[in-house]
Amino acid sequence: MKNVIDPFISLSYWPSAGGFGSNTNILETNIINPSVVLSVLIYFGKGVLSNLLDNRKQKILNTIRNSEELCKGAIDQLEKARARLREVEMIGDEIRVNGDSQVEREKEDLINAASENLEQLEDPKNETIYSEQQRAIDQIRQQVSRQALRRTIGTLNSRFKIELHLRTINQNIGLFRTMMNTPD
């Protein structure tokens, strides 16, 4: 056992070499050691740092590209929707103006025709005038009802399903037949 302890005892007599530590005095330090450490850190750290920055840059660029594409798609869809809205508004305005002006024209034409007929006829022909007025009024009613029916059918065609539309038509035909068969 003595042989095992002897080497440790002899170590206690050796003078210590100073050990590791940091020397903050620049004049006492070896300038080569810190420069080597700094060079190694810069050399290896530069590659890692540049890779991290490149990856981050690519992610940012991809995000920007995706955002721009989504924005362009949304703008295109918005423009298409606006163009479609303008078309529909113009068509609606045309239908409204044409329908109203046609009804007014026909009404004015019939009133003018009735007025002319009244001017041409004299007092003894009041019955003829009355019948012509009734005919003109009936024509106006028919034309107005036709126009209203056309508009109603257009509205029904666009709003109801075909089954409901057919059921409504059949009910109206039945009502019309009963009205035609019923004497006044």
UniProtKB/Swiss-Prot annotation:
The keyword Signal does not apply. This is ATP synthase subunit b, chloroplastic. It comes from Pinus koraiensis. In plastids the F-type ATPase is also known as CF(1)CF(0). It comes from the Eukaryota. F(1)F(0) ATP synthase produces ATP from ADP in the presence of a proton or sodium gradient. F-type ATPases consist of two structural domains, F(1) containing the extramembraneous catalytic core and F(0) containing the membrane proton channel, linked together by a central stalk and a peripheral stalk. During catalysis, ATP synthesis in the catalytic domain of F(1) is coupled via a rotary mechanism of the central stalk subunits to proton translocation. Keywords: ATP synthesis, ATP-binding, CF(0), Chloroplast, Hydrogen ion transport, Ion transport, Membrane, Nucleotide-binding, Plastid, Thylakoid, Transmembrane, Transmembrane helix, Transport. The chain crosses the membrane at residues 31-49. The keyword Transferase does not apply. PANTHER family: ATP SYNTHASE SUBUNIT B, CHLOROPLASTIC. Belongs to the ATPase B chain family. It is found in: Plastid, Chloroplast thylakoid membrane. InterPro entries: ATP_synth_b/b'su_bac/chlpt (IPR002146).
